[in-house]
Amino acid sequence: EEKPDAIVDVATLTGSARVALGERIVPVMGDDGLVRRVIELAGGVGESMWAMPLPPELRSVLDSEVADIANAKPGHTAGGMLVAAHFLRAFVGTRGEGTDAAPIPWAHLDIAGAANNSGAPFGTNGKGPTGIAVRTLLALTEDFSRP
């Protein structure tokens, strides 16, 4: 309803991010322009993020015979974090009304791996919870506030 300039979500939806990129790199999925912006700002504040694709063919995994959308498909394990991102994208919305309305720019940061450091301290992170993405979100907020 508010039609924001962009939507950025930070979540731990599946363990797939940890499997794919380990505990130090956050996969970022969404609209290419916003994903690039998030990753660039993350690098500037010392957080490691990596763009991941959203292959269109994975969206069909969420098709359901009894609901508008399913959040998972029993037995389907390939591309778990990508399927989860497709699920989130389904709720993003558009900037206007009608079929030609532009989508709201959106990025999903899957912090399942990087939210907790089980290894040796690195950078500004000790062992344990890392607070990953906080500095990036602050940098993004500052970036959006500039004219």
What are these regions, as identified by a protein language model?
Residues E1-P147:
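A generic structural signal for tightly packed, nonpolar segments enriched in small/aliphatic residues
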